[in-house]
Amino acid sequence: MALLKFSPRFFLRTASLFLAAALTAGTPGPKLLPEADESSSSAPVRNIIIDPGHGGVKPGAKGKFGTLEKDVTLAVSLKLKALIEKTMPFRVILTRDKDLDVSLESRAAVANNNDAQVFISIHANGSVRSKSHGAETFFMNVNASDEETRKLAYLENTGEELEKRIADEAQDAVKMILWDMAQAAYVRQSQRLAEMVQEDLNLELGLENRGIKQAAFKVLQGVACPAILVELAFISNPEEERKLGDESYQQRLAESIHRGLVRYLRLFPQK
């Protein structure tokens, strides 16, 4: 009897879908955006997932003048979606397109359920130091680049209800094994995508270059494609908060991320 052969990408997709199902089993989730309808064309549909951070009852960081991270991330994500769909042969799927509370695991599931080529999570930074400023871009690694990055990942991850933490140690071990497999396949592409987006943010906007970093952001875990998390600027810095709330500046942020993505796709063309 002939043995069936599966590609590494098929295996990673299957493993990631199993992970997403394991993490969300038994927990009622929010109504997600529908999966893409591919019936209208015989050509393969290529999807980019944009993830506006936070939402709903989880506003994220809040600025001195009342600007909310969840509003900034959605505004920039919508502008980025429009740019990509206007200039690239990709369909863009948002993990949320309104003020919704979407779990971190469900955001990853949106990427895997739609066979994403790229996953970009958009955030605005916060700090107890109001003078902290600049942009930084992250890709997934279980070991954080430094202590400050480890603390940031912890704050982003524990934004979820604490009761959702995994209690079953065996399930937790499976989660890390599956992610290590996905990480091995996509870490190089994720790093290059992070580098290019970070370079264009700094080049266009003159932001302090806080560099690219690695950390165990929960929203990136289990995503079976190149994945990054972008911290646009510090909403806790009054000067940067004013900029983040300005629609023209949001457009410039979206254009900068778009340019980095274009350069990445030239380096790693999608089949």
Regions found by a protein language model. Name each.
Residues 30-171, 184-195, 199, 255:
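Catalytic-core regions of hydrolytic enzymes
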Residues 6-16:
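N-terminal export leaders
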Residues 14-25:
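Bacterial N-terminal signal peptides
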Residues 2, 9, 21-22, 37-38:
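N-terminal and secondary-structure boundary signal
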Residues 173-177:
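Short, basic/glycine-rich phosphate-binding loops at helix/coil junctions
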Residues 3, 27, 271:
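Basic/polar, cationic surfaces and motifs that engage anionic cell-wall
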